Amino acid sequence: MSQSDXRSGXKAREEALEQWVEERKKKRIAEKELRRINKKIKKLEDENPWLGNVVGMLRKKKDEEGGPPAKRARREDMEIDSTPGRKSKARGFTDQERRDHRRRKALENKKKQLAGGGKNLSXEEEEELRRLARDDDERERRVAGPRPGGVNPMXGPPRGAPGGGFVPSLQGVPESPFSRTGEGIDIRGTQQFP
């Protein structure tokens, strides 16, 4: 390798180094500028909470363009045996009522979460929540599930297997065995088993 080759090699290296230093300097300045802009945006969003809704709408639009597919609604058509022992459907809720109730609860949760960040539901969601709440309040009060009364109701024949079945009935038995009179569990052996 001659002297001139070594000189041109060193010159090329110097130029590359200068360019590298220059570009890194530009990068540092750009990053500093970006941090300043982000700070300014955050300050604007903090001072004007309504901007959060705009950001949400922009994100939503971006997701619609090429985001993941939306969640499919849960399907409610599970097969049910129609045995004679099933409780009548009059006590239960219709599928539409269940869907409405679930949607109302979801909207209420969303409202709470947004309120934590100083944001609000969109006008359509707010209107839908009001409508669902009104429908829920106007609906006739019912309770899902079995009839009240427990395993051994006070009145009527005991439910379950003959001879006690689930547990001996302890209704009407005072807590202390020493103050107790009347029926209940035989602890002294003077009565028969209830």
Swiss-Prot record:
The modification Phosphoserine is found at S2, S122, S176. The modification Phosphothreonine is found at T181. The modification N6-acetyllysine is found at K71. Residues 128-143 have a biased composition (Basic and acidic residues). It holds the Pfam family HDV_ag. The keyword Flavoprotein does not apply. The modification Omega-N-methylated arginine is found at R13. Residues 20-194 form the HDAg domain. It is found in: Virion; Host nucleus. SUPFAM superfamilies: Oligomerization domain of hepatitis delta antigen (SSF58108). The keyword Transcription does not apply. This strain belongs to the genotype III found only among cases in South America and which causes a more severe form of infection than genotypes I and II. This is Small delta antigen. The lineage of its organism: Viruses, Ribozyviria, Kolmioviridae, Deltavirus, Hepatitis delta virus.
